Design a protein with these regions (language model features):
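Active-site loop of short-chain dehydrogenase/reductase
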Residues: 4, 75-76, 121-134, 169-172, ...
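Substrate-binding pocket helix/loop in short-chain dehydrogenase/reductase
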Residues: 90-91, 98-100, 195
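A short, exposed helix-loop element centered on a Lys and neighboring polar residues
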Residues: 114-115, 161
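Conserved Rossmann-fold SDR core element
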Residues: 75-77, 157-160, 164-182, 223-230
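Conserved glycine-rich cofactor-binding loop
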Residues: 12-13
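C-terminal substrate-recognition "lid" of short-chain dehydrogenase/reductases
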Residues: 111, 207-230, 235
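Catalytic loop of short-chain dehydrogenase/reductase
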Residues: 130-155, 160-161, 165-169
């Protein structure tokens, strides 16, 4: 059986690193991208892993990432759009530079690489696009200062539904995974107790749970245009 080929963006740490490792453990061939991923101490190039440096917000990086997958592994079966940045501020304090930075990574960084990957997937008549969003787009919190992150991340589930319908005849699926607060180095240990209370099931989301959702989607060919929320039920209600 031919090994599946995946592209993972934002792969040098956190969720992206966890996904990359899990896919490699399961026999995938992976092209992993982040700005300086070749400096990573956690990932080393191998016959199954290609590292591509570059800002995914730039079209030339997206082109380079897709080309690396085709050059080294001859196809693209899975694209995991994980790259994203979170910049909390009161809405009126955001600068044009903040806006450009977040739109660049969270929107342009999704658009360009997806466009490249889907073009190759159409030639194969198969493929799967998975985007990582957040359930805070469903259930914003008072005082959280997240309006700009929500503006950029709320597009992901809607975009993937549209993509799912546009390319279903080409054998291409598109789905979304939306976690709540994830236990990554981005959150200081001192903040964990407060962050747990943001979920009705009072704990942080584990990276392994996001990996499990991805593996489920990979194994479920009739699931298309879906948004799997992993937040202990936070999206379902405002009080608990």
């Amino acid at each position: 059986m031919t090994a599946r080929v995946a592209i993972v963006t934002g792969a040098s740490s956190g969720i992206g690193l966890g996904i990359t490792r899990a896919l490699l453990e399961r026999g995938y061939r992976v092209v992993a991208n982040s700005r300086t991923i070749s400096d990573s101490k956690d990932l080393q190039p191998s016959a199954s892993l290609v590292l591509v440096d570059g800002d995914i917000a730039k079209k030339e990086t997206a082109t380079k990432v897709a080309a690396a997958a085709v050059q080294h592994f001859e196809r693209i079966d899975l694209l995991v759009n994980n790259a994203g940045i979170y910049l909390p501020k009161p809405f009126t304090d955001y600068t044009p530079e903040d806006f450009e930075r977040m739109i660049g990574t969270n929107v342009a960084g999704y658009f360009f690489v997806t466009q490249q990957a889907v073009a190759h997937m159409r030639k194969q008549k198969s493929g799967h696009v998975v985007g990582i969003s957040t359930t805070v787009t469903d259930q914003p919190l008072a005082g959280a200062h997240i309006s700009l992150p929500v503006l950029t991340k709320s597009t992901v589930p809607a975009f993937n539904r549209a993509l799912a319908m546009e390319y279903v005849a080409d054998g291409i699926r598109a789905n979304t995974i939306s976690p709540g607060v994830v236990d990554t180095p981005m959150h200081a240990n001192a903040d964990h107790e407060a962050l747990k209370k943001l979920h009705p099931i009072p704990r942080l989301v584990q990276i392994s749970e996001i990996v499990d959702a991805l593996l489920y989607l990979e194994s479920a060919p009739m699931v298309n245009g879906e948004n799997i929320r992993i937040d202990g039920g936070a999206h379902a209600g405002a009080k608990w």
